[in-house]
Curated annotation (Swiss-Prot):
Domain Piwi: 500-799
Keywords noted in UniProt: Cell cycle, Centromere, Chromosome, Chromosome partition, Cytoplasm, Nucleus, RNA-mediated gene silencing, Telomere
Record family assignment: Belongs to the argonaute family. Ago subfamily.
GO annotation, cellular component aspect: ARC complex; cytoplasm; cytosol; heterochromatin island; mating-type region heterochromatin; nucleus; pericentric heterochromatin; RITS complex
Protein purpose: Required for G1 arrest and mating in response to nitrogen starvation. Ago1 regulation of cytokinesis and cell cycle checkpoints occurs downstream of dcr1. Required, indirectly, for regulated hyperphosphorylation of cdc2. Has a role in the RNA interference (RNAi) pathway which is important for heterochromatin formation, accurate chromosome segregation, centromere cohesion and telomere function during mitosis and meiosis. Required for silencing at the centromeres and for initiation of transcriptionally silent heterochromatin at the mating type locus.
Source species of the chain: Schizosaccharomyces pombe (strain 972 / ATCC 24843) (Fission yeast)
Protein name in UniProt: Protein argonaute
Amino acid sequence: MSYKPSSEIALRPGYGGLGKQITLKANFFQIISLPNETINQYHVIVGDGSRVPRKQSQLIWNSKEVKQYFGSSWMNSVYDGRSMCWSKGDIADGTIKVNIGSESHPREIEFSIQKSSKINLHTLSQFVNSKYSSDPQVLSSIMFLDLLLKKKPSETLFGFMHSFFTGENGVSLGGGVEAWKGFYQSIRPNQGFMSVNVDISSSAFWRNDSLLQILMEYTDCSNVRDLTRFDLKRLSRKFRFLKVTCQHRNNVGTDLANRVYSIEGFSSKSASDSFFVRRLNGEEQKISVAEYFLENHNVRLQYPNLPCILVKNGAMLPIEFCFVVKGQRYTAKLNSDQTANMIRFAVQRPFERVQQIDDFVHQMDWDTDPYLTQYGMKIQKKMLEVPARVLETPSIRYGGDCIERPVSGRWNLRGKRFLDPPRAPIRSWAVMCFTSTRRLPMRGIENFLQTYVQTLTSLGINFVMKKPPVLYADIRGSVEELCITLYKKAEQVGNAPPDYLFFILDKNSPEPYGSIKRVCNTMLGVPSQCAISKHILQSKPQYCANLGMKINVKVGGINCSLIPKSNPLGNVPTLILGGDVYHPGVGATGVSIASIVASVDLNGCKYTAVSRSQPRHQEVIEGMKDIVVYLLQGFRAMTKQQPQRIIYFRDGTSEGQFLSVINDELSQIKEACHSLSPKYNPKILVCTTQKRHHARFFIKNKSDGDRNGNPLPGTIIEKHVTHPYQYDFYLISHPSLQGVSVPVHYTVLHDEIQMPPDQFQTLCYNLCYVYARATSAVSLVPPVYYAHLVSNLARYQDVTADDTFVETSEASMDQEVKPLLALSSKLKTKMWYM
């Protein structure tokens, strides 16, 4: 049976009223005057209509030919850098030729413009007052205002999407990458008004430096001789499309020194051994790159043994003459050291964030912005104040009828036992150490294991085998062989298949961690736990307790649950789903991975998981029907009940993808239910979760915040700065250890359950207290967190992924979608991903 749900997003049913009423400051600035005239909208085609780099299209827009064609209308026109343009004036339809080359070497490209429609910004006033639904007219109006707001900062700053940077005071992150701090601004529709959301933005950029110096830092080479031995072709994918100039002593100040090249890769041979054919006096001549620069530019290469960079048209340039162009974002994934440096750079106390936002607002000086002024747009320079509520903290149940009432979102495990330890004792397990005996001697491991077993025993986990066999990894063997050896050793000593395997790693890195997880999760079907050697040496009971929380759920236990009074699910059997899609980073191979977790108990504490591969960068989850059928059957098998309600938390979707979630994923959930029985029709609620936004909230009174100056856990914001009529709210559910608390933005897309807002908001908040591996409330509902964890581990089951940077063709980036390595059936009912 096919099901076609409504394409409308759920409307706000009302507001909540529970909790302490407070007032917060929000980083939104109200637009007090909008353009009150009709704006002409035009369709723009550059060249043959194929995608043109944004920088090039912006150069064309700023060309003298386009300015002459537009006349006086150019100054009040706004261009999106792609295919749309808006103007107060009338511009004739037509096509002109623009020279994008030099005067000596002209290169013409066509620029066509055609009027497509008119937009009336009065529709925005109706929209924010819930008198007009969202349609292309509203979206075009918001896009126009966004671009109008960007126009002035775009003239002098480095801009990316909604963020702008001066490029000054960068801080090194290592590897030729540095962190810049700038500001973010975006037009937002709110309840009764439009506003500008302003925030601090931090991003990683390639350092404006010699490419040679950056390569040496990236490869950790201390001198150029070491770099000549390094296979730079392996880095082709990493450095591809990086823009450089070619500068040497004999072209300083010339157009040639300013010409920008885009790296395509690195040559396999050195500059002295890389040859090309040129025509000289009518004859073809073979010449090396090193010889060419000596003959044609009178410069001798200092490092002729280094390879060259490859650019378009097959040209080759010596690395030592190349300089990285300023203002290029570093889009690859930061390594662990760079990430730590970025966190230190970006973290700010709340009052510092407020001050910097206010400073940026005054620097932008919207009142004197000529583009805003000519359209009559005025923006208030004071942060909005918004009403908020602080919900009551839930109570948590542990074993032995122990009830915990957290304070400020935190508690500890002292004197507590897990609610539901594994019924069978731990009879068989083993430890493998990937650190040398010199760095971590056996005595250190034995001391740790004694504390570890004592701590887990006090938490309720019963160990028959208190002293497991310990092996040191033989680095000559593969990780697969080592895992199998450890499995057999545990089985031999314990006379039973291992309950889990324990691995001690030297540091937190993708390997051998990834291989351990792949082998244990797919081949051996045994839970695995990894720990870092420095923690083993310290042997702290608190660290052991943290490991215990993971071990307990991996072997089938439950750590804690909400007390009945704190659980809004009540007695109605409810399946909770969490969904997420992981996409490979820039330059990485591999497929996208969709992961769904589902509760298999009546309290929403225990979750099983499914992950599937799908085409790269596809956000809608494929095969949702089959996945949900499997998860519904699992819920029934574990609880002996059929869920009467399904609550689906979906992460990672942008506002533009909301309808896709309704029309595709919700439809398949419905079909899954009907496939089990034509009469089976549970009520469904679909809610998206978003953390990648720039809404931030700051306390007005100290008594309404924590010791760091952030709003308290349980703070709900659902008025003023939320959507004009859709059912959304912001929730700060966690205590922030450092920096500014990031609220999660919840948007209910579809609601058949019709829980009152108070009940649903309380459910979202209270679930954050039963995340299985923490003794603090987390920032996001656990099913979504679990889906993240599943996706992260499922990457190691992707047979097409390759974390090494090798030369890659465009075709290989669109490779066939192969299924992930199958999860062992022995793990399917356990929380193996913790």
